[in-house]
């Protein structure tokens, strides 16, 4: 599509309306490159994405995405084997975290049926290993001391040396106070110094690093701290070297994943762009138009996007209709209507919502041409007419049946009679070429052309004779007429003069009466349509209110059911805890073997009341993502009767499967277990399985990682993990639950507080996970 139309209709200003809604630099780049598309499937895809985003907002009322800088240059540098600085790594860390958050957000979506966005969400990749490593970079762009053992050692030594220097200098401040200009420790060239009065410079031995501008103060590094300061200087150099080494290592970690990270960044930016388009649509009461298979246009209550408080109008361009000619005097809003049509079409073909009501329809044109300039008159120079005619000639040479042509004041700038003839001839050529055209003119001759010619329709802008001002209401099918006599009368022109003027135009009186009747009929039809629209709006508000109440009721019902389930689960947990106590006593007396204890515990669990979870959203979602393929050796499974997780190890000749479930090997039929969906990142690396080894209480500690788990799944794994740890006499275990929303962390705390076998538990030290991990002492 030609770029000139974008300038003429100020399409860039429309794009600026969307800019405030964007949060990522990637989406800003996408907006800047946005242009009208000429392929209906691509436009339809853009509209489907907005519809999907609307569903997300209806269900969740928000779609969170953080501000992200562009990482394109950083990724190019990685491809060139360059190392990234810490700020570049911090931005990539945010992209990785945002990708993970978006994946979890998508997995939690309920009652949303996507048409296009699902492919974007599913193409996002997670990098748990990279994210774990990048925890060493804090949000302030600083490397944490636990980034490497060497960095921790250097910083510890640095802290100790600086503390010793401060202590020595603090003592000297007290002892040599009368020799100092100020009672403080200063810094010069990265070394700690004392501000000594120049007259006493020889009283303190050391190295002079600076002299004040007045010469009254000398900054001396006392000899007592010279060696320590040199040590600090060396340690800082070592620190910089180690930080550079760590940044190099981080860059090497990222290099194999550049293409995937780039794809993630693009998806996040595109989702942000779709979000912005939806918010623009919502705030401006815009809609997603339908796309016609032919050149049909139907814009209902369409508004100009760049005007404040624009007047809404209906415009219908049926398939058979070739041209609409807007006639009537100037200053009535004809040019605005012309631009409104052009901008609505440009926005729609760019995949943007259109400022029109639901049910509106756009066509798909290969090109849109316009000759729109300042209003012309016969007093203007011939050069202006020549300029416009040159442009019109160019349009006629390039336009075809897949084009939309817009002419403002066609034929103006020359003799009225010749101009009107030229305008009719140009419109006739476009009509015969089947090219959709809208033209404005103040020539009365074109009214007759619009009435007498097939597939051409007149239109005009409404004028309020009472207020003597235009209403900017578009009246399709009604030719424009002059209101000169009414205006002159209301402004006080003598009645006999007005009467005489009317007599001089008797030949046009019949036409004017017909136009007046058409105007009256159009206004009456519009009033009826407005009344119908008011009723439709009331019905729409009522339907929305009913839907909102239903959603609120469903939400409250789900909360109550969840609460009841939790209470029931607590009762079951209490019973199971009692059984654990009995089993532990038996184990302590060596009356049962470990596998016999687990079998006994499974029998006890069968006594627990069975809860009907057929309508549980979480379990239903788990069923949805269950692998739709035959099981294979190595697949992760959940044993239905036990609710425990295991791994398929082999298949027997009779079709049954052998599975390792904790420390027990089981034989199962295929209907006794379900497959667990394996994340993409787990396909490229061996799955890490937490194994509790037999050891005494002072031996190695077991670790359970619950990050990314569902609440029910996490609690089940935690219960099984503690069981195995107790059976194997583990004295201490680590549970990694992350920080996240805090749901898993709170669940772990509640479980440990209730479990009688837990002697003590507390968050891990800061360098071992902090509040993202819990250390548990068993006994």
UniProtKB/Swiss-Prot annotation:
One GO molecular-function entry: mismatched DNA binding
Domain of life where this protein originates: Bacteria
Pfam family, one: Smr
Keywords carried by this UniProt record: ATP-binding, DNA-binding, Endonuclease, Hydrolase, Nuclease, Nucleotide-binding, RNA-binding, rRNA-binding
Residues given in the record as ATP binding sites: 328-335
Assembly and interaction partners: Homodimer. Binds to stalled ribosomes, contacting rRNA.
Family: Belongs to the DNA mismatch repair MutS family. MutS2 subfamily.
General function of this protein: Endonuclease that is involved in the suppression of homologous recombination and thus may have a key role in the control of bacterial genetic diversity. Acts as a ribosome collision sensor, splitting the ribosome into its 2 subunits. Detects stalled/collided 70S ribosomes which it binds and splits by an ATP-hydrolysis driven conformational change. Acts upstream of the ribosome quality control system (RQC), a ribosome-associated complex that mediates the extraction of incompletely synthesized nascent chains from stalled ribosomes and their subsequent degradation. Probably generates substrates for RQC.
Name the record gives this protein: Endonuclease MutS2
Organism of derivation: Streptococcus agalactiae serotype III (strain NEM316)
Taxonomic lineage of the native organism: Bacteria, Bacillati, Bacillota, Bacilli, Lactobacillales
Gene that this polypeptide is encoded by: mutS2
């Amino acid at each position: 599509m030609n770029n000139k139309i974008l300038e003429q209709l100020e399409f860039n200003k429309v794009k600026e309306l969307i800019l405030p809604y964007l949060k990522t630099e990637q989406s800003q780049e996408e907006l800047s490159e946005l242009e009208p598309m000429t392929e209906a499937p691509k436009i339809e895809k853009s509209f489907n994405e907005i519809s999907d985003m609307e569903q997300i907002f209806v269900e969740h009322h928000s779609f969170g995405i953080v501000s992200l800088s562009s990482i394109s240059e950083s990724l190019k540098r990685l491809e060139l084997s360059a190392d990234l600085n810490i700020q570049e790594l911090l931005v990539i860390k945010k992209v990785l975290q945002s990708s993970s958050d978006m994946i979890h957000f998508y997995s939690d979506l309920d009652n949303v049926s996507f048409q296009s966005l699902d492919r974007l969400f599913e193409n996002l990749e997670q990098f748990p290993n990279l994210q774990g490593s990048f925890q060493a970079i804090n949000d302030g762009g600083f490397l944490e001391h636990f980034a490497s053992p060497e960095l921790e050692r250097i910083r510890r030594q640095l802290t100790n040396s600086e503390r010793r220097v401060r202590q020595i200098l603090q003592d000297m401040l007290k002892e040599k106070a009368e020799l100092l200009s100020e009672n403080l420790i200063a810094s010069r060239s990265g070394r700690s110094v004392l501000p000594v009065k120049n007259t006493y410079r020889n009283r303190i031995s050391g190295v002079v690093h600076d002299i004040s501008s007045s010469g009254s103060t000398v900054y001396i590094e006392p000899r007592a701290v010279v060696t320590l300061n040199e040590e600090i200087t060396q340690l800082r150099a070592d620190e910089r070297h180690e930080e550079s080494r760590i940044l190099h290592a981080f860059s090497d970690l990222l290099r194999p994943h550049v293409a995937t990270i780039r794809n993630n960044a693009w998806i996040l930016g595109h989702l942000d762009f779709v979000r912005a388009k939806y918010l623009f649509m919502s705030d401006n009461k815009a809609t997603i138009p339908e796309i016609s298979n032919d050149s049909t246009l139907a814009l209902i209550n369409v508004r100009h996007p760049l005007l404040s408080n624009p007047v809404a109008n209906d415009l219908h361009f049926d398939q058979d209709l070739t041209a609409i000619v807007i006639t009537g005097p100037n200053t009535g809003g004809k040019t605005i209507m012309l631009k409104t049509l052009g901008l609505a079409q440009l926005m729609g073909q760019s995949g943007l919502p259109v400022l029109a009501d639901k049910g509106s329809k756009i066509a798909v044109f290969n090109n849109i041409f316009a000759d729109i300039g300042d209003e012309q008159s016969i007093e203007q120079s011939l050069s202006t007419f020549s300029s416009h005619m040159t442009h019109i000639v160019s349009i006629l040479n390039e336009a075809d049946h897949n084009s939309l042509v817009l002419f403002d004041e066609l034929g103006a700038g020359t003799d009225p009679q010749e101009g009107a003839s030229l305008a009719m001839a140009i419109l006739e050529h476009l009509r015969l070429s089947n090219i959709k055209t809208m033209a404005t003119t103040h020539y009365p001759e074109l009214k007759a052309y619009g009435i007498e010619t097939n597939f051409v329709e007149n239109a005009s802008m409404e004028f309020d004779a009472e207020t003597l001002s235009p209403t900017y209401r578009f009246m399709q099918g009604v030719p424009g007429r002059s209101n000169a006599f009414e205006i002159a009368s209301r402004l006080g022109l003598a009645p006999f003069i007005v009467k005489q003027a009317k007599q001089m135009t008797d030949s046009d009186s019949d036409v004017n009466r017909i136009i007046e009747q058409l105007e009256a009929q159009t206004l009456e039809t519009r009033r009826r349509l407005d009344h119908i629209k008011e009723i439709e709006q009331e019905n729409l508000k009522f339907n929305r209110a009913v839907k909102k109440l239903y959603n609120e009721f469903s939400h409250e019902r789900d909360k109550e059911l969840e609460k009841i389930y939790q209470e029931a689960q607590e009762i079951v947990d209490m019973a199971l805890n009692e059984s654990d106590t009995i089993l532990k006593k038996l184990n302590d007396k060596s009356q049962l073997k470990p596998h016999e204890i687990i079998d006994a515990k499974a029998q006890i669990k069968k006594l627990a009341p069975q809860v009907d979870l057929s309508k549980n959203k979480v379990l239903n979602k788990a069923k949805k993502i269950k692998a739709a393929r035959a099981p294979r050796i190595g697949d992760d499974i959940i044993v239905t009767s036990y609710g425990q997780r295991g791994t398929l190890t082999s298949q027997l000749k009779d079709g049954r499967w052998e599975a390792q479930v904790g420390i027990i090997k089981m034989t199962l039929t295929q209907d006794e277990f379900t497959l667990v969906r394996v994340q993409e990142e787990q396909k490229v690396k061996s799955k890490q399985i937490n194994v509790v080894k037999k050891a005494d209480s002072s031996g190695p500690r077991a670790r359970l990682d619950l990050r990314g788990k569902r609440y029910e799944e996490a609690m089940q794994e935690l219960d099984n993990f503690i069981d195995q740890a107790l059976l194997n006499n583990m004295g201490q275990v680590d549970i990694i639950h992350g920080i996240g929303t805090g749901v898993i962390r709170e669940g772990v705390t509640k479980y440990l507080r209730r479990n009688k076998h837990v002697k003590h538990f507390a968050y891990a030290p800061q360098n071992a996970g902090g509040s993202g991990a819990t250390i548990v002492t068993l006994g």
